[in-house]
């Protein structure tokens, strides 16, 4: 999937790795936007050739601080909240990641992740459980009731994600949006009609 296809639902400014804004319709802009994106991540340690890296500000770390590392690892693009200068003197900026500047990298990550996985939530019924207490119990009860009614179910919870017969232990109580979209995609591929979370 090209970078341009992933950015369809997003308001953004396109920049080269020297911090310069580029018109999306210019030759340089078209070259940057035509890049194939092989995968997406917000973990700089996992970013590699052809990938799109989400520079997310966290409580303990800021993904923007890892942009140069991600560029050296061959990332095709970086989603950021401010311009990034990654180019050294004499470097061809077209050999470095495209920089996509947005107001919120969290919102951008959610929209891009949905597009990357083919908008899987549009192909299943979604059930969201909210509240203060009893969410996990209610989630498992809803899943059990609907499965007994013959509905193929997926589940994303604070303990685990369940996709068909596959159980994935949770790394965090709330997965990042790109992980949720990946789970949704796997659920669609596994034939799930509905997901409860």
Residue ranges and their predicted role:
Residues 107-197:
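Phosphate-binding loop of NTP-binding sites
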Residues 1-111:
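N-terminal leader/targeting and accessory segments in enzymes
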